[in-house]
């Protein structure tokens, strides 16, 4: 963010800036730090050869391919890392120095993402507990407070110090094992005299020192043996040795005692120590100071720590994650070099630096990181907003973090320190609620991984405030004015009493007592929440839903700007990278659908445009030129709009005419009634591109062939194939047709293996024995559309493990239909229930039929009244041909500011259009509507307006499914579950009750037997249906009951049923 000299203006930072800064920090600092840790490697036998890297000579090479080519050819967009290495012979002091290639590092593109194997991937920032010491108090089973101090290492390991009733201090190395703090300090190198000199309460340490502990801490070896015995839970008497010390160092001290730079700073600040920053390991002095503070806590001195406060958290950014992986790759490279040197000397070969180093460790480490690490995710590209929001996520999950199953409510809850740093609204729904957050707009990651937020410093001598960034540990000591104190007139501010924040409490103070103030109304919201107009009138749960649903909106074929917005639409569109921006000024000399040629500074620049590309959510990405030929443009001007942008502004939905009223029950329970105009005029029509892929392999019988000559297939299924056997571009394909013809070789069976009648049939019909089987790529159900692209990616090299890949892209045009999901920007969502003819829709007093009918009962109970303000203001803006950009919390200027704005605009629209029904004082914002079927007016006036409605990606074409036949589970013999497996619908316990309530016994029996798991009965249904007659009723038990009987038998329980005769009451036993 940039502040100017006027002291009141600032610019919003780039939304991708955090990703860029993290990657630059890794390239500038992280590489150097890890390379400097690479040790000098000596030969293990005679130590005559020494290998080392020269850190200052490393350099990265510009990639040989472009981003588009990397995506097209499924390659990684990376840079080669070179560094000078030296091989020194100690006997002769000769050194051989060479520049070697040690691997590829994936680069970050202009969107803040990386391209790995042709896929856009992004690294999520992680929130971890900051290393240091934290004191807390818990009640034991007797209701007595137990004080503990937890030391967290840089690796995430924990060492707990606790004090018992007798004021004895223990170090707990595991849940069951604990050891005296005197033994731990002695094992770390201190003797009893040093311990007593460095503590504030020596008498307490001496009070619980018995004879055994005196003997143990008398020597370091005895203390280490005692500690090893407790830590490793070994019996007997272990013998002190170097291997024992090495094992203890690796398993305990390295994991639980390495604090790192951040941990050392936190430890020094919390315990008032002055240990140098380069001492990153836990020292005996730290342990003793922590014990002193724990004793003080026991007697009421000191304060407990809030572990959920952001000052006790740190951000593990993309720089830290990439640096950790680079360090891991160098450790692997070290072991490779060491083995290679030993092998060369063993075989009496002369090694060179070039022969010792391989690029495999670095390349494979980063490939596995981007492909398998939980914090490396595939970039969600549903719409432009989704792309920028994805890179600003914060996760408590991942390695070293929390788990969704064990995280408590307190960890998920909003903390006051989130103000201006983490959005209190934007989070996931479901099991990850509160664990996946989003950065606030102005937040940045500072040194040490702390989240910083900007404030204006209020100075008594000058009206111009300085803009300062504060970490969570600093701003709690200042009086911070809340966001509603951003009045324009400073004179008004000085007279009023304003709400403020101080030490996580909310106070009311005079203006002259305030130290800091917020800089922006959106400062504490994320991007998604900042795009909701009138958000202050909505319940937070509905605002959360809206933030998530805006990321699910599909780009429409005809985008439209929102009438009522917040002003951040242009910034979101710009930073998403979906628009084409002029890199320099010049003149447009040629424009087309696929490129724009710009002339300036004596040369020409060709700017390629994105045409009908597929996102990973099957939505379309397309750029449309917005500048005519011959126009002079400036640097930074928009040349082409993206799939969901208009004029450089984000455009995710449509402004449609909406009425809030019931209509024959078709909008019951959030259902939505729409007009056929939305279908016929392509208002909510969207394009979706599906990808179908096939690979050719070399089998044991020979290579697979791509051909258009497929035997035993009907000709109309092959009509769209070209001479190579691949579907032609521009073809219209239906479900079941062949996209790629492929034959896989198979071993021909001998003639004698066939049955006699089959051999006779082959001889009569002249059928030859086939040596290959058909394995064509067929279009699945629901995939009909137009073929827009075919890619045949040839394999590089002759390896059979690197097959050829053929990809077919099919474009589908989807109008809105019954079953699709639509939503507003206030959490008001619904499913299309019916599409009415436009003449049957309710119409306004000027004859215009409405486009959508929402249920009015969905507003008061959900407390998202912001949709009513947007609805009415959008109607006024449509009549006045205006667009509004509303900042949130406008009541900071005056009471009822939102209502006054809406009513004033409606009144002006009523005057300018000479339509008094637009604003009627008796029921402002409402109007009398007429029934389109009868022409009669409705009894009550209805709220009408033009809100911004989105079409979401949850579409009925992707979800509707029916099963006529399919596979059955092997164990239960019931139909499989899921659309992808052609599964069936489960008739569960409550469904059976419902059918029983209606008395449909025969229907219920069919569902539980023929259509489910009665094997014998369902086999007889097909023949009976073909030949006619009644379907036989099943007599024995279905397979699921038989399975239950077998499972009970495995528990030694026998279950049988008996039939009792009515005549002689004899029991006839029958096996289950």
From Swiss-Prot:
Keywords for the protein's UniProt record, in alphabetical order: Chloroplast, DNA-directed RNA polymerase, Nucleotidyltransferase, Plastid, Transcription, Transferase
Keyword Nucleotidyltransferase: yes
InterPro entries: DNA-dir_RNA_pol_bsu_ext_1_sf, DNA-dir_RNA_pol_su2, DNA-dir_RNAP_su2_dom, DNA-dir_RNAP_su2_hyb_sf, RNA_pol_bsu_bac, RNA_pol_bsu_CS, RNA_pol_Rpb2_2, RNA_pol_Rpb2_2_sf
GO terms of molecular function: DNA binding; DNA-directed RNA polymerase activity; ribonucleoside binding
Domain of life: Eukaryota
The keyword Plastid belongs to this UniProt entry's keyword annotation: yes
Reaction(s) catalysed by this chain's protein: RNA(n) + a ribonucleoside 5'-triphosphate = RNA(n+1) + diphosphate
SUPFAM superfamilies, A to Z: beta and beta-prime subunits of DNA dependent RNA-polymerase (SSF64484)
Record-linked PROSITE patterns: RNA_POL_BETA
EC number: 2.7.7.6
The protein's assembly and partners: In plastids the minimal PEP RNA polymerase catalytic core is composed of four subunits: alpha, beta, beta', and beta''. When a (nuclear-encoded) sigma factor is associated with the core the holoenzyme is formed, which can initiate transcription.
Annotated family: Belongs to the RNA polymerase beta chain family.
Function of the protein: DNA-dependent RNA polymerase catalyzes the transcription of DNA into RNA using the four ribonucleoside triphosphates as substrates.
UniProt-recorded name of the protein: DNA-directed RNA polymerase subunit beta
Gene that specifies this protein: rpoB
